[in-house]
């Protein structure tokens, strides 16, 4: 079983079609990885599916970087 960080990064690579080395914890989905609003919605949906959780819209709007996604999952998902 891979770590939450590895799983989140893998989803970002798959959803945004970026290279793995571009996906650093400080990377912003929009500014650094070129995501648009639809990409970010699809990314949140993929995170929900992978981690079997529901991310409310008001929380999803706050997840704008790889680290924020990792932190959200760590604090809301039972490992």
Swiss-Prot record:
Q: Which SUPFAM superfamilies match?
A: ACP-like (SSF47336)
Entry's Gene Ontology molecular function annotations = acyl binding; acyl carrier activity
PROSITE patterns, per this entry? CARRIER, PHOSPHOPANTETHEINE
Enumerate the subcellular locations listed in this protein's record, separating them with semicolons. Cytoplasm
Where does the record place the modification O-(pantetheine 4'-phosphoryl)serine? 37
Q: Where is it predominantly found?
A: cytoplasm
Q: Name one GO biological process term.
A: lipid A biosynthetic process
Limits of the Carrier domain: 2-77
GO CC annotations? Answer: cytosol; membrane
> Is Lipid metabolism set as a keyword in this record?
yes
Q: Record keywords: Phosphoprotein included?
A: yes
In terms of InterPro entries, this protein maps to: ACP, ACP-like_sf, PP-bd_ACP, Ppantetheine_attach_site
What the entry lists under NCBIfam families is as follows: acyl_carrier (TIGR00517), PRK00982.1-2 (NF002148), PRK00982.1-3 (NF002149), PRK00982.1-4 (NF002150), PRK00982.1-5 (NF002151)
Summarizing the function annotation, the protein's role is: Carrier of the growing fatty acid chain in fatty acid biosynthesis.
Family, according to the entry, reads as follows:
Belongs to the acyl carrier protein (ACP) family.
Name of this protein: Acyl carrier protein
- Lineage, broadest ranks: Bacteria, Pseudomonadati, Pseudomonadota, Gammaproteobacteria, Lysobacterales
């Amino acid at each position: 079983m891979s770590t939450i960080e590895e799983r989140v990064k893998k989803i970002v690579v798959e959803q945004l079609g970026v290279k793995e080395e571009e996906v650093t914890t400080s990377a912003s989905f929009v500014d650094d990885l070129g995501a648009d609003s639809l990409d970010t919605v699809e990314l949140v949906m993929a995170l929900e599916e992978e981690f079997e959780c529901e991310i409310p819209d008001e929380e999803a709007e706050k997840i704008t970087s790889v680290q924020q996604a990792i932190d959200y999952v760590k604090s809301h998902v039972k490992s």
